[in-house]
Amino acid sequence: MKRLPAVAGSFYESDPKKLKMQIEWSFRHNIGPRDIPKQTYEKKKRDNLFFVVPHAGYIYSGPVAAHSYYYLVSEGRPDVVIILGPNHTGLGSYVSAWPKGEWETPLGSVKIDEEILMQLVKESEVIDLDEKSHLYEHSIEVQLPFLQHFFDDDFKIVPIVIMMQTPEIAEFLADAIYNVMQKNPDKDIVVLASSDMNHYDPHEITVKKDVEAIEKIQQLDYKGLYEVVEGKDVTLCGYGPIMVNLILAKKFGKKAYILKHATSGDTSGPKDSVVGYLAARFGS
């Protein structure tokens, strides 16, 4: 079973050569890390297990996303990347994983880690196996070319989209991921929370709203983040995935480090209506 790209040619370049150039542009951008990460091939214990990455078009959020990938790549190739994204389309189940096969992008195909996936399904009791949720969803797809650029096809993924973004669902998923990571100590597993921040307010208002959410992220306060999103009109689309990583970070004794916050007005255009982007890592 192969999942074909839905947003190649719109969110990112569809030509492989141009796509690689676009990814390197993201790293060298003045909003980005301004450098290409050097990949280590020495196998050692990974410090940064969990990340927040944005998922807009690369011309808007690529330079911010590059900050998270800089740290991920610098610590070497993971065996498995669990990618949690919000469900923008409203299709499919409340929490759904692509069941098997591979995902294709212009840079090639990446296989699903079916063994880890089925362990998660068994542990969580809330994950459905459902392709419909993923067919047109961009939040996971846009992460793959960044990973493929450095690791080719030498890693596997577990793609999960979350429509019901509640603290209770986040707790179920975090417990399941924690248990699976504990049961597979020889597998190098990282978890990406794919999310943009506040949407379509002027730059100054977006920054103010985002700062309130970022404070909760720094405190690993997942319930506080939920309250900010729900109570203060912060239109943060992937708060469910972020809540999962906040819970996991606390379970693993990690701290939150904000790598970069910017808006689409900073990266590529007008500031009268912008989207906020955040890169964060959770490590020692």
From Swiss-Prot:
This is MEMO1 family protein YG5714_2180. InterPro entries: MEMO1_fam. Belongs to the MEMO1 family. Pfam families: Memo (PF01875). It comes from Saccharolobus islandicus (strain Y.G.57.14 / Yellowstone #1).
